[in-house]
Structure formats: C-alpha cells, structure tokens
C-alpha cells in the first residue's frame, strides 16, 4: 500500500465552476493564429533525424536553441519519458474502375473486427470505416485491385456497405484465406502523409514517417514528435538515468481536423483509441510518489496520460463500469463532478480495477480537449513539434506553458509523514530527489545568466533570446515562443523541428 500524506485541501482540489466552464468554451480559436509561410512547412525531414533543431523552454519562460541530439543532456536523471509506439499503416488505397475513374479509399478505423490486433490478423475479409475520394463516381459495383504478393496474384475487392457516421463502411475481401489483412494492406496501400505537405507520398515516406520505436499497427498519421529520435539518442537517455516507457494511441485522421467554429466550445474533438498496461499505471504512481518528472513525447502521449486520472474517476463514480465503457469525453476535465478528486487516488483505483477485471492491458478511448484552463495532473514536460495555426494542438501547447501552479503532483512524503513539502516546494528541493538540472541548464547565480561552460558543452550555440518588451507584453507566451522559432529559421509541422517544454 502506498503511504500518502494528504496535502492541504487547496493542493488536491481543482474546482471548475460553471462560469469557468463557460469561459473555456468561449475561447476564440482566432486568438491562436499566427503567420506561417508555406516555405516554413517542412516537406521532408532533415537527413539525420536527430540533427533537427530543438527549442527548449523552461518553467521560467527562458528559451534556448539546441539540436535534438542534445536532448539527453537536457533531461534530469530520474525522469520518465513516455513515447507512443503506434505504427502508421498504408491506409490509402487506390482502385481503378473499368471506366478509368480513380477511386481512393482511406481507412480510418476498424469496424469488424473492431479490435486493432484482431483486425490485422483477419483472414478473408474485414470491414473498415473509410473516407472515399471521388465518391460520386462509385456507384454500387465492387471495386477490384490485383496485388502481387510472394510471386502470386491476389485479387482485393472493396464493397461499399453504406454510410457510417461521417464516413463509409467498406468491406474488403481477398481470394487467399492464408493471408492476413496486415499483409494485404501493406501491399495494397501507401503511407497517408499529412495533407498540408501538398505533395504525393514517396517511397521514402514509408521509412521517414515512422518512429524508430514504432511497433503496434493502427495509425493513419504518425506521432510526429517521435520522428526525431534515433536509437543513439534513446541509448544515451537510458545511460543518463532516464526511464523510457511506451503506450499506444492510434492517431486518427481527426488530428488534421480544422477548428471551423468561432469558439472551441462548438468544436467536436475527435476520438482516438489507446492502450496502456497496468505496469505503466503503477510506474506512473511510483514516479508521482517519488516527485520525479514525467515527459510525454508528443501530444498523443499527452492526451493518453492526462486521460488516465479521469478513467480512475469514472471507476470511483461507477465501480462496476465495463472495459468497453471506458471513455473520456472532451469536456470531462472541466466539469464539476470530475474536478474534485485526488490524482493518485484515481490512478490507484484504476490499477486495482485492472486487477479485479483480470486484465493487464486496457484499451480505452479519449476525446479529451486540453485547452487553457486545463488542470494538468501527470505530465510536466513535453517533446513536441510546432503546430498549425488555429489548431487544438496549439491550444494544448498554450495550456501547458501557461499552467503555472495548476499541477496536481501532491505533497507526498518521500520517506515518512514528517516531510511537509508541497508540490511547488519539492521542485525547489530537487537535489534531495536526485533531480538536479543537467549542467548545461545550470545558471550563474551572480548574474542569473547561463554559464560559459554551458555554451561550450553543446554543438549548437545556446543563447538566451532577448526580446523587445514593448512588443511582447501583449503577446501570449505561446506566441512569443513561436515568434522565436520563426525568427530562428525553425521548420514547422510534421517533418519540422522539435521543442522541449518543461515546468522546471
């Protein structure tokens, strides 16, 4: 049993009044706009993944510029870094009608079998929710495509069953029952690169648009924050005392869905399926208990991790909830009934629920919206790219860097109940927790500026960016950061450069 010393009431509760809920829903997406020239959108990655640029913004708002390969020297020992190990599938398939018309089918999510693992092992036939390009030219006739697999000709047939929400239900069938759908889609389709790249998929995208640690097939878009990692960077992180862990969230096409409403309250967040193990839940509990940092690699990892306490809260409200009912709604974090719970208690409840249901891995779903005013409970560091103007991902970034004191890492005694440190206090006592900053992040106390040794310890020049106060006073923090990235020739979006955002 975890020994928890409850902090004062104000440190564990986050009360969301109806007025605050209205304020969050009334946030105008136009406030999250910025000029992004097309030439700043990276069409391809840099030649070596870890040689892209990396902007580092700390909890005091100081910004330095590095190469991504410097990441291991930026992260304190004892930190847990959590990556999304999903793998992008060849989700786009082109069929040619006898008339010559080209029909494109874009697989979104499985219908039958509904489980991703079972879907890719399906033989003979399966059904998907799909988008259809040039749909008006496709009547009721089946579409066929000849595939060449292991020196054999395989016929793949697509039948349009009917509407499925905002998409179509498509049945795929193939004339060799020995082949799985994983083999079929690998041969029939191609990687669905983001639409804003304004180019066709290339053969090299099948490598470039996958993370080096991708394992579990199911995404139709890459968790792009992870594209910069090389095995060398991962090995150095581990050697420096960083715990590397994985979860799975299958990225859907909704990640590219623009916000069309004037306010975010009218924007329906897309739903994505994720999987987490009981072991990871228990390790997160241990990390929070020991006051150690948790860095999420990418916004998909953020959404998964920050959804976990709300799954625990759902169980506390409905103890007999079934696995298939485990879903976090986009507004749950801002509703009063989900505000007044302790994060660790919720996670421990979730861990016990795993045991009582006899499962080791939970598959659930989330449509969580992380916007300014969100109560961050788990993540206190993010590795992320630079996102599109007026996107929900930009809302997430703004929420994180403006969070200040809203983190809910409780003041838990490390060894006994006599330690009364609050969440904010333990960050000042990081030496006792072996959380001292890496040398290249230490500052000279005499002038509060970076030491010369730090500058010489990296291949890239480390420079505190001086800004015109009169020009920046009215700008939100996210905009100041993005302006610096633009001014320093950063490349944006999926194949672009990286950033490390921390609260310390």
Language-model-detected regions and their locations in the chain:
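Low-complexity, intrinsically disordered or signal/transmembrane-proximal segments
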Residues: 11, 15, 404, 410, ...
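Ala/Thr-enriched low-complexity intrinsically disordered regions
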Residues: 16, 405-406, 411, 415-417, ...
């Amino acid at each position: 049993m975890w020994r928890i010393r409850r902090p004062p009431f104000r440190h564990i509760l986050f009360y969301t009044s109806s007025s605050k809920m209205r304020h969050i829903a009334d946030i105008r997406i136009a406030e999250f706009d910025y000029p992004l020239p097309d030439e700043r959108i990276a069409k391809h990655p840099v030649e070596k993944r870890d040689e892209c640029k990396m902007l580092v913004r700390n909890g005091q708002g100081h910004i330095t510029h590095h190469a991504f390969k410097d990441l291991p020297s930026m992260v304190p020992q004892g930190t847990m870094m959590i990556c999304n190990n999903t793998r992008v599938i060849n989700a786009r398939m082109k069929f040619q009608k006898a008339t010559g018309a080209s029909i494109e089918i874009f697989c979104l999510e499985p219908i039958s079998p509904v489980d991703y693992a079972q879907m890719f092992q399906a033989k003979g036939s399966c059904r998907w929710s799909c988008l259809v390009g040039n749909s008006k030219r496709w009547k009721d006739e089946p579409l066929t495509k000849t595939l060449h697999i292991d020196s054999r000709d395989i016929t793949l047939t697509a039948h349009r069953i009917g509407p499925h929400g905002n998409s179509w239900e498509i049945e795929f069938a193939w004339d060799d029952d020995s082949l799985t759908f994983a083999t079929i889609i690998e041969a029939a389709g191609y990687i669905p690169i983001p639409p804003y790249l304004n180019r066709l998929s290339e053969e090299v995208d099948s490598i470039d648009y996958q993370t080096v640690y991708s394992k579990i097939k199911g995404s139709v878009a890459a968790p792009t924050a992870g594209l910069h990692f090389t095995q060398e960077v991962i090995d150095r992180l581990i050697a420096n005392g960083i715990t590397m862990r994985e979860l799975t969230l299958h990225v859907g096409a909704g990640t590219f869905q623009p916000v069309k409403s004037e306010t975010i309250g009218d924007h329906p967040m897309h739903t994505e399926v994720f999987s987490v193990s009981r072991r990871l839940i228990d390790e997160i509990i241990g990390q929070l208990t020991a006051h150690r940092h948790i860095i999420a690699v990418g916004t998909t990892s953020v959404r998964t991790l920050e959804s976990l306490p709300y799954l625990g809260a759902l169980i506390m409200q409905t103890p007999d909830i079934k696995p298939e009912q485990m879903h976090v709604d986009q507004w749950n974090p801002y509703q009063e009934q989900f505000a007044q719970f302790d994060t660790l208690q919720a996670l421990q409840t979730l861990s016990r629920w795993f045991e009582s249901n006899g499962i080791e891995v939970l598959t659930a779903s989330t449509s969580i919206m992380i916007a300014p005013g969100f109560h961050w409970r788990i993540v206190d560091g993010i590795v992320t790219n630079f996102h599109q103007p007026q996107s929900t991902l930009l809302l997430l970034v703004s929420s994180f860097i403006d969070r200040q004191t809203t983190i809910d890492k409780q003041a838990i005694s490390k060894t006994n109940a006599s330690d009364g440190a609050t969440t904010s206090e333990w960050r000042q006592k990081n030496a006792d927790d072996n959380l001292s900053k890496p040398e290249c992040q230490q500052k000279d106390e005499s002038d509060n500026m970076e030491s010369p040794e730090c500058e010489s310890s990296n291949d890239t020049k480390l420079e505190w960016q001086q800004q015109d106060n009169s020009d920046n006073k009215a700008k939100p923090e996210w905009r100041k950061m993005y302006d610096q990235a633009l001014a320093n020739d950063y490349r944006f979006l999926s194949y672009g450069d990286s950033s490390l955002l921390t609260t310390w």
